[in-house]
């Protein structure tokens, strides 16, 4: 089973939108497990206190209760994820272009969305 580490942006999108191919992702790329870093949970808790992102953050936090979590500390979630990829490689799920490029430059794999479908980027 491949663990896919979720960035904040991806988790919010996953929790708040209807994803067209969510049930077939396992058959397309093998069995996956979404994993939520503690740094992402902390970021979502902060966002849940802001007016602009409050509802999306709360929805994502509720959604994350059903996912595996992993300890990954850092001042910022993206930085914690980058450090993890730098040390161990892995697959990261994000919709943030800057984070995508950094992960790819470190040799990591990227999962994202296109037209509300989960896709692997090369």
Task: Give a label for each model feature.
Residues 1-66:
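Domain-level signal for Mg2+-assisted phosphodiester chemistry and nucleotide/NA-binding surfaces
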Residues 39-122:
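Nuclease catalytic cores that cleave nucleic-acid phosphodiester bonds
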């Amino acid at each position: 089973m491949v663990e896919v580490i979720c960035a904040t942006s991806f988790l919010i999108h996953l929790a708040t939108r209807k994803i067209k191919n969510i049930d077939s992702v396992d058959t397309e790329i093998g069995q996956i497990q979404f994993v939520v870093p503690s740094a992402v949970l902390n970021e979502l808790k902060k966002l849940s206190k802001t007016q602009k992102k409050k509802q999306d953050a709360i929805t994502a936090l509720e959604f994350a209760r059903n996912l595996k979590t992993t300890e990954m500390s850092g001042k910022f979630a993206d930085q914690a994820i980058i450090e993890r990829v730098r040390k161990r490689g892995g697959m990261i799920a994000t919709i943030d272009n800057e984070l995508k490029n950094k992960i790819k430059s470190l040799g990591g794999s990227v999962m994202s969305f296109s037209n509300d479908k989960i896709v692997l980027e090369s």
